[in-house]
Every structure is written in structure tokens, then in C-alpha cells.
């Protein structure tokens, strides 16, 4: 069986990392070798200090993540032995990377208010100030997502859209299993029942 990539996309703070980890664990329970790959592992070191908000937003969108390297790594991996292994790629703006043909896309949706609340909680735990976090949200994360959604329309292209406003009760908004092989569909069902 061929190797597969499944992409878990969504706003910053939508619960992608948590959902992707649950999906990888469920795939393993279905007998697959599953690994997580985070778009955050492909960040470029960029100094945002002193930039005007519009310049900061543009730099974040255009240069912060090395999407070409993501695409190269996935292509090389997907061309490996037909062992049925799965990579669960999670992160923001994933359609900017060149994903292997047939990659199912799962998009997690949350309100801007809930995303902001989660980002604040996450980043305060990392020692950032509320002011610094609000600046990142307003100058990088949300403007980049607006631009990404206008350019790539992930909601229209998604195989699965999940309302993840409540982590404990994710709700399927739309689902097409056409590109979800049975083990992936079963793993997704397991995650949706368990969350």
C-alpha cells in the first residue's frame, strides 16, 4: 500500500496540533505507521522588530515558513517504499506547500475570539506578555490567514471541515470520503468519537 500524507490545516489556535496528534494515534491503532510533521519545524529565522504592521504581516505570510522545503520533504518521503505509512502534516496555510497528489485536507474551524483566547493561553505559558501576543495575532497570524484564505480557499478545497470551537466536541461541518482511504476514515471516526 502506498504511503499517504494527510494535512490538518486551520487558523492559529484552532487545535491543529492536538487534533493531528489524536489522528496519528488513531492511525497507529488502525495498524498504520503514523508520524507527525509540524509546519512549525520549517520556520525561517526572521527578525520582525521595527517593522510596520503591514510589512510584518507580509513578511510573515511570504517568508516565515519554508513551504518549498515542506513540499520537497513530503515528495521524497511519499516516493519511498509502499509500506502504508502515513504522515499527518499539521499547521497553518498548508495549501501554500506542494502537497503530494491526492493528499486529503482536513480544516479545523474556530471563531476568531476562541482562536485569540487559545493563542493567549498558549503563548502566556511560554512567557510572552499579553501585549506581545496580541501584536503577533493582529500583525501576523490573523492578517496572514485572511490573505491565505483569499488566495487558496482551503474551506472550499477541504475534504473534511470540522467545527473545533469546543475541543471536547468537534463537529463535522462537511465531509467527503472520496480521498480518505478506509484506514484514514476509520481513524478520523475514532478521533471524532473520542475528542
Question: Where would I find each of the regions flagged by the language model?
Answer:
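Conserved nucleotide-sensing/catalytic segment adjacent to the nucleotide-binding pocket
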Residues: 35-38, 43-89
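ATP-dependent NMP and nucleoside kinases share a basic, alpha-helical "lid"
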Residues: 87-125
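Extreme N-terminal, non-catalytic leader segments
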Residues: 1-6
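P-loop (Walker A) phosphate-binding loop of NTP-binding proteins
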Residues: 11
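Post-Walker A helix-loop "phosphate-sensing" segment adjacent to the P-loop in P-loop NTPases
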Residues: 25-35
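Hydrophobic positions on the alpha1 helix immediately C-terminal to the Walker A/P-loop
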Residues: 19
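Conserved lysine of the Walker
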Residues: 16
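NTP-dependent small-molecule kinase module
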Residues: 120-125, 146-195
Amino acid at each position: 500500500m502506498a504511503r499517504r500524507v494527510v494535512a490538518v490545516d486551520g487558523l492559529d489556535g484552532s487545535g491543529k496540533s492536538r487534533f493531528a496528534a489524536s489522528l496519528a494515534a488513531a492511525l497507529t491503532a488502525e495498524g498504520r505507521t503514523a508520524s507527525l510533521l509540524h509546519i512549525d519545524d520549517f520556520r525561517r529565522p526572521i527578525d520582525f522588530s521595527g517593522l510596520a504592521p503591514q510589512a510584518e504581516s507580509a513578511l510573515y505570510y511570504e517568508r516565515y515558513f519554508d513551504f518549498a522545503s515542506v513540499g520537497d520533504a513530503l515528495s521524497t518521503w511519499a516516493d519511498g517504499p509502499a509500506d502504508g505509512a502515513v504522515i499527518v502534516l499539521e499547521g497553518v496555510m498548508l495549501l501554500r506547500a506542494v502537497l503530494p497528489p491526492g493528499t486529503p485536507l482536513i480544516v479545523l474551524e474556530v471563531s476568531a475570539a476562541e482562536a485569540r483566547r487559545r493563542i493567549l493561553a498558549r503563548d502566556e505559558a511560554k512567557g510572552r506578555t499579553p501585549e506581545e501576543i496580541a501584536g503577533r495575532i493582529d500583525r501576523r497570524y490573523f492578517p496572514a490567514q485572511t490573505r491565505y484564505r483569499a488566495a487558496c480557499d482551503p474551506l472550499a478545497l477541504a475534504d473534511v471541515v470540522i467545527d473545533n470551537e469546543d475541543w471536547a466536541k468537534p463537529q463535522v461541518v462537511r465531509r467527503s470520503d472520496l480521498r480518505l482511504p478506509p484506514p484514514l476514515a476509520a481513524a478520523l471516526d475514532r478521533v471524532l468519537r473520542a475528542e
